[in-house]
């Protein structure tokens, strides 16, 4: 299983944003929508072996959305319809346990630490994407890939990742948009799987 974790530092945790003005009203959920689409979209379908987790930090309490490719339905390649799926998920009451809003989309209360602990307990290896990390190995085909939103990761988040044993890796020396990083990681992992 390949997992992507994107931290949305100002992303709203309530559904009171306009689909007509995502950048201005949602806490930049548009950035996260692009990440979701990059994680799943294929030419004529979606990836079934990927999960994408959005950590929304811009509300009174953080929430986590999980998109699970094995069950995912209704995902289209545009930001607006992806934002509508997020808005629908945010309209249900989140609890400490996962609740499904639409097929393959789940919500729960939680933060980066709680999510990474649960993924690590599944036996997943953690990778933190950062420009100055070690080059991502061409043999990596699965794992948890953690990225920041347009603001990057905070020092506390980087310390947490380090304390949990995340390997800091890079796909190149330049700072790229998170959604572009996801496309590149998917490509690298697809190629690694072919070589096995």
UniProtKB/Swiss-Prot annotation:
Kindly list the biological process annotations in GO that this record carries: tRNA methylation
Q: Which GO terms describe its cellular component?
A: cytoplasm
Q: Where does this protein reside within or beyond the cell?
A: Cytoplasm
Q: Name one Pfam family in it.
A: Methyltrn_RNA_2
Its EC number is 2.1.1.257
Please, which domain of life does this record's source organism belong to? Archaea
Tell me where it mainly resides.
Answer: cytoplasm
- What residues does S-adenosyl-L-methionine bind to? 129, 148, 181
Which reaction is this enzyme known to catalyze? pseudouridine(54) in tRNA + S-adenosyl-L-methionine = N(1)-methylpseudouridine(54) in tRNA + S-adenosyl-L-homocysteine + H(+)
| InterPro entries linked | Alpha/beta_knot_MTases, TrmY, tRNA_m1G_MTases_N
User: What keywords tag this UniProt record?
Assistant: Cytoplasm, Methyltransferase, S-adenosyl-L-methionine, Transferase, tRNA processing
Give the enzyme's main class according to its UniProt record, as a single word. Answer: transferase
Molecular function (Gene Ontology), one example:
S-adenosylmethionine-dependent methyltransferase activity
Q: Which family does it belong to?
A: Belongs to the methyltransferase superfamily. TrmY family.
The record describes the protein's role as:
Specifically catalyzes the N1-methylation of pseudouridine at position 54 (Psi54) in tRNAs.
Tell me the subunit arrangement. Homodimer.
HAMAP family for the chain: tRNA_methyltr_TrmY
Q: What is this protein called?
A: tRNA (pseudouridine(54)-N(1))-methyltransferase
Which organism was this protein described from? Methanothrix thermoacetophila (strain DSM 6194 / JCM 14653 / NBRC 101360 / PT) (Methanosaeta thermophila)
């Amino acid at each position: 299983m390949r997992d992507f974790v994107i931290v949305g530092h100002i992303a709203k945790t309530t559904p009171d944003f306009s689909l007509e003005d995502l950048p201005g009203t949602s806490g930049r959920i548009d950035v996260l929508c692009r990440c979701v689409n990059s994680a799943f979209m294929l030419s004529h379908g979606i990836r079934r072996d990927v999960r994408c987790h959005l950590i929304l930090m811009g509300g009174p309490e953080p929430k986590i959305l999980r998109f699970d490719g094995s069950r995912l339905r209704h995902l289209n390649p545009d930001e607006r319809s992806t934002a509508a799926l997020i808005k629908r998920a945010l309209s249900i009451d989140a609890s400490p346990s996962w609740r499904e809003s639409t097929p393959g989309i789940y919500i729960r209360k939680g933060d980066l630490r709680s999510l990474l602990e649960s993924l690590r307990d599944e036996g997943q290896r953690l990778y933190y994407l950062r420009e100055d990390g070690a080059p991502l190995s061409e043999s990596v085909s699965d794992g948890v890939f953690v990225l920041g939103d347009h603001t990057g990761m905070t020092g506390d988040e980087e310390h947490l990742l380090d304390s949990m044993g995340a390997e800091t890796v890079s796909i190149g020396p330049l700072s790229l948009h998170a959604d572009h990083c996801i496309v590149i990681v998917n490509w690298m992992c697809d190629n690694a799987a072919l070589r096995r």
